[in-house]
């Protein structure tokens, strides 16, 4: 019973937001979970639509379970937003796959960027450039 999850704001939810979950179902996921910011989104802005409307739309669109990302993570930086969401999904103990969409659509390019950001050499290479104002 593979479970796929997505981390989102859905402010508001639109068809494109559902594509990663639909792709996961086509790859064998039998259940889907979404963790979504509540009535406030990143940068502390109020959500366009109330939380309840976004949950109803997600459930109506086929998402099996919608969880609310705790407020301190929802209004935080992208790094803390993602960390809080991943920790929450991990605590469920049933999520097998984390799915996402991207504007570029190039998984290989995203993997290269991720590898570069995780490189132990990055801080040493970045520090002199930042110090020079680059």
Predicted regions and their residues:
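Nucleotidyltransferase catalytic core that binds NTPs
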Residues: 1-134
């Amino acid at each position: 019973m593979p479970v796929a999850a997505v981390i989102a704001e859905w402010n508001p939810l639109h068809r494109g937001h559902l594509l990663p979950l639909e792709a996961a179902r086509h790859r064998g996921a039998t259940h889907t979970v979404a963790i979504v910011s509540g009535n406030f989104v990143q940068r502390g802005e109020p959500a366009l639509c109330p939380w309840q409307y976004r949950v109803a739309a997600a459930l109506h669109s086929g998402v099996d379970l919608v969880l609310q990302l705790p407020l301190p993570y929802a209004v935080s930086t992208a790094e803390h937003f993602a960390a809080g969401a991943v920790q929450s999904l991990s605590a469920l103990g049933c999520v097998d796959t984390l799915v996402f969409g991207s504007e570029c659509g190039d998984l290989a390019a995203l993997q290269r960027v991720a590898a570069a950001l995780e490189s132990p050499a990055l801080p040493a290479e970045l520090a002199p450039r930042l110090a020079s104002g680059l």
